[in-house]
């Protein structure tokens, strides 16, 4: 097993879009109406300096990054294939490491997650994100999404 993280390349967006978890595909469409390749490319371009790919045996199994709102606030995102959590402990350790690095740069991270995406919600809670409210009609499909955040000084 060779599981590691590197800076993303544009082609990672297309490669990952073919194997994305069904929950991520559903969340992408519900929030934006976009297909996986469009959403990944947009996320990559919006967070290029803070965009990373998770690799497993030479294949992209996940991408994540931070879209910067301003010098204090960022929007974290992560999309992955079913293989992303194949090695749960390694994935969790890397998640904490990169989250701590992001928290060194931003005072607040926030975003929204589809209420149906229970695996992502559990993962976010395990990383210390707080869920503030349920938005009953969010995004393109007007589905329920949770707002979540993590603040440096709370």
Model-derived segments and spans:
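A short beta-loop-alpha structural element at the N-terminal edge
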Residues: 2-18
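Conserved beta-hairpin
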Residues: 49-64
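Conserved acetyl-CoA binding element of GNAT-fold acetyltransferases
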Residues: 72-85, 90, 146
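C-terminal "cap" of GNAT-fold acetyltransferases
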Residues: 137-154
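Active-site rim helix/loop that mediates acceptor-substrate recognition in acyltransferases
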Residues: 30-50, 100
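A conserved beta-strand-loop-helix scaffold within acyl/acetyltransferase catalytic domains
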Residues: 64-72, 135
């Amino acid at each position: 097993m060779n599981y590691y993280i590197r800076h993303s390349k544009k082609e990672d967006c297309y490669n990952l879009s073919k194997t994305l978890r069904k929950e991520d595909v559903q969340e992408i469409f519900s929030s934006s109406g976009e297909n996986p390749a469009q959403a990944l490319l947009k996320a990559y371009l919006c967070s290029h300096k803070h965009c990373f790919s998770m690799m497993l045996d030479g294949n992209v199994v996940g991408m994540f990054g931070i879209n910067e709102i301003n010098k204090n606030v960022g929007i974290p995102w992560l999309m992955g294939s079913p293989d992303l959590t194949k090695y749960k402990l390694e994935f969790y350790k890397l998640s904490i490491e990169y989250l701590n690095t992001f928290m060194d740069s931003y005072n607040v991270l926030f975003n929204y997650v589809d209420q149906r995406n229970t695996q992502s919600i559990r993962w976010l809670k395990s990383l210390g994100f707080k869920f503030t409210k349920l938005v009953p009609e969010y995004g393109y499909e007007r589905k329920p999404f949770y707002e979540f955040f993590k603040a440096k000084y709370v």
